[in-house]
């Protein structure tokens, strides 16, 4: 079965639409939103519904309130920001279920927007509880999921809720996410290059194993590279290594090589005597990492190697930074890779693992073909998994 999208629903006019969005945005200590990409990403879907004078009921979680009310995790800042972006009032409901919410939804006028309070104030959300899902669905006519970033979670507002709606669809953000995933993984223009970074191999091994059936080249940077390098016999000093995964890393490396995949690892790195922005640093080759020092970024020769490997790429998928880019001394490798990816002639898809943050910080946002809003969801798609939120959309898309 295929997913039905909101623009394939024949009659939205004045209907009450329950829209699952992901407004899990970062806040500062004064409850101000510091980055609103996730809110802006669903504006096309909300505006499309409003063009049909629909009544839009938005539902999201924020943070981890652990199944109980906590003012710190209120959706109020998100409702306020959305109101500004839409140029119209977004009413914040006092709860996400209950009589008070039902009254608000029943009294909505065509073109009204209501934001429900944090879904995770109830344990039923993360337990995928049917009763909680039914309570959410009450009083609405159509279900729309436009929260790709939580679609790998079998939660009540993502999965169970679809049982209680006659019409189930996805929004335009979801459409973009699925479209770019298919362009990069299902029908890629080759050569297809995967860049994987970040601290740990453990979160990426399944991704790597799945990618080995699809890609032409793999580039490994970040802390995870040093588990591979140690497995290959290099002395990596105090660099981050997952000792329990050395054998698995070596097997994955050998398997990729057997399949004819070009497998790139760092040839030099920026090392420090301690994990500290003020640490003493120097550039060394991989063969000469001093005892007691740790590698915290890729070096200039590696940047050249990786950039050259990208030159003939037609599709690039990137997840995870090349070093501890939050510290200025170890940010150059990641920013150089952002530049190499942004200035390539390939279709470029970036997702999760702080890679999107690095792209924003480097000011190259506009040159990337697509930046995924999903961290864990993006990774699970790369692993070849069926996401619960996507599966129910496929199963119920044309019921």
From Swiss-Prot:
GO terms for molecular function: ADP binding; ATP binding; phosphoglycerate kinase activity. One of its GO terms (cellular component) is cytosol. Pathway: Carbohydrate degradation; glycolysis; pyruvate from D-glyceraldehyde 3-phosphate: step 2/5. It catalyses: (2R)-3-phosphoglycerate + ATP = (2R)-3-phospho-glyceroyl phosphate + ADP. One of its GO terms (biological process) is glycolytic process. Its EC number is 2.7.2.3. Pfam families: PGK (PF00162). It is an enzyme of class 2 (transferase). Substrate binds at residues 22-24, 38, 61-64, 120, 153. It comes from the Bacteria. Keywords: ATP-binding, Cytoplasm, Glycolysis, Kinase, Nucleotide-binding, Transferase. ATP binds at residues 204, 326, 352-355. The keyword Transferase applies. It is found in: Cytoplasm. Monomer. Belongs to the phosphoglycerate kinase family. This is Phosphoglycerate kinase. The gene is pgk.
């Amino acid at each position: 079965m295929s997913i039905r999208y909101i623009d394939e629903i024949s009659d939205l006019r004045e209907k009450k639409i329950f829209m699952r969005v992901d407004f899990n945005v970062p806040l500062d200590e004064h409850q101000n939103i510091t980055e609103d990409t996730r809110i802006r990403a669903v504006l096309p879907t909300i505006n499309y519904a409003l063009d049909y004078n629909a009544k839009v009921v938005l539902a999201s979680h924020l943070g981890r309130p652990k199944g109980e009310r906590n003012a710190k995790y209120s959706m109020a800042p998100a409702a306020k920001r959305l109101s500004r972006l839409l140029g119209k009032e977004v009413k914040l409901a006092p709860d996400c279920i209950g009589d008070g919410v039902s009254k608000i939804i029943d009294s909505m006028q065509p073109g009204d927007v209501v934001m429900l309070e944090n879904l995770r104030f109830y344990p039923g959300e993360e337990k995928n509880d049917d009763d909680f899902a039914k309570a959410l669905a009450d009083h609405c006519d159509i279900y729309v999921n436009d929260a790709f970033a939580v679609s790998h979670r079998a939660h009540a507002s993502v999965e169970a809720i679809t049982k209680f709606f006659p019409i189930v669809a996805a929004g335009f953000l979801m459409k973009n996410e699925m479209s770019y995933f298919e362009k990069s993984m299902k029908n890629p223009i080759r050569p297809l290059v995967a860049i994987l970074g970040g601290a740990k191999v453990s979160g990426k091994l399944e991704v790597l194993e799945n990618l080995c059936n699809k890609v032409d080249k793999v580039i490994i940077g970040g802390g995870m590279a040093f588990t591979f390098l140690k497995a290959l016999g290099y002395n990596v000093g105090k660099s981050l290594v997952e000792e329990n995964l050395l054998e698995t890393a070596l097997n994955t490396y050998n398997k990729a090589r057997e399949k004819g995949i070009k497998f790139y690892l760092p040839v030099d790195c920026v090392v420090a005597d301690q994990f500290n922005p003020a640490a003493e640093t120097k550039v060394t080759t991989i063969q000469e990492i001093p005892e007691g020092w740790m590698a915290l970024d890729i070096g200039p020769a590696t940047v050249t190697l990786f950039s050259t490997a990208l030159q003939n790429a037609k599709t690039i998928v990137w997840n995870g930074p090349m070093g501890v880019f939050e510290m200025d001394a170890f940010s150059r490798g990641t920013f150089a890779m952002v530049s190499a990816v942004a200035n390539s002639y390939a279709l470029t898809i970036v997702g999760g693992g702080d890679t999107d943050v690095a792209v924003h910080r480097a000011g190259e946002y506009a040159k990337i073909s697509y930046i995924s809003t999903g961290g864990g969801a993006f990774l699970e798609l790369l692993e070849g998994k069926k996401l619960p939120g996507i599966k129910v959309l496929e199963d119920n898309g044309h019921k």
